[in-house]
A protein has these predicted regions:
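Juxtamembrane "helix-exit" motif on the non-cytosolic side of transmembrane helices
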Residues: 51-60, 112-122, 179-189
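Non-cytosolic membrane-interface motifs at loop->transmembrane helix junctions
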Residues: 59-70, 125-133, 189-200
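Hydrophobic transmembrane alpha-helical segments in integral membrane proteins
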Residues: 1-16, 133-143
Length: 218
């Protein structure tokens, strides 16, 4: 039953990623549309890769999936950054700085992946399970990013025009994701890979889209 739940999570996230991409192209303001398209695509690629690990009959192709298996560690912080910007409701702050952050985060991710060796295990319930030698470093990198964003959102609660309800959603979601990652670092895994955090943030970004009007500047 646990493996069935894992497959359902993967398929749900893949479907929701396609749905979210479509909504992003329809309603997002131009200044964040390209950014969100890139980040949501990271979610999509990662979960297609995880689903392929479940159904592949040969391990030959798994080495090509290495760069996308851990994309959640950068996709979640990057999407939190975008959601925070929207809920801040600042007319002065430019979103272009987020593209700089995106570039730096992606470069660090590429570096960690490049220096990591891949090991493959076979699971009766989950198919192939691929791990990298620097997995703990990847989790720590993600935790640092999420920790910074958590502090930022707590600070933003005092801003006069900020969407405080939305920011509270972000804070609670970040705490849930960080707890999940700490539990995994402690060696406790319900599923072979974390999937709960991605689902939470895909749902939140769709709530953000509900606040966008189609008539906004595109």
């Amino acid at each position: 039953m646990v493996n069935f739940a894992y497959y359902m999570f993967l398929l749900l996230i893949i479907f929701l990623s396609f749905f979210t991409l479509k909504r992003n192209l329809e309603v997002s303001p131009k200044k964040i549309k390209i950014y969100l398209t890139f980040v949501i695509t990271l979610f999509l690629l990662r979960h297609i890769g995880l689903f392929m690990l479940c159904i592949l009959q040969s391990s030959n192709i798994i080495y090509y999936l290495k760069p996308i298996i851990y994309l959640n560690h950068i996709a979640m912080p990057l999407i939190v950054l975008a959601i925070t910007y929207v809920y801040l409701r600042s007319e002065v702050l430019k979103f272009t700085g987020s593209y700089v952050v995106l570039s730096i985060v992606v470069l660090i991710y590429i570096y960690i992946i490049r220096i990591s060796k891949l090991t493959i295990e076979v699971s009766q319930n989950y198919g192939f399970i691929a791990d990298i030698s620097n997995e703990n470093s990847m989790y720590l990198f993600s935790l640092i990013l999420m920790g910074i964003l958590l502090i930022l959102n707590v600070i933003l609660l005092d801003k006069p025009y900020a969407n405080k309800t939305g920011i509270w959603f972000i804070i609670v979601s970040i705490v849930v994701v960080m707890m999940e990652e700490v539990i995994i670092l402690g060696g406790i895994k319900v599923f072979p890979y974390s999937v709960i955090g991605e689902l939470i943030f895909l749902i939140i970004i769709n709530f953000v889209f509900n606040g966008f009007k189609r008539s906004k500047m595109n």
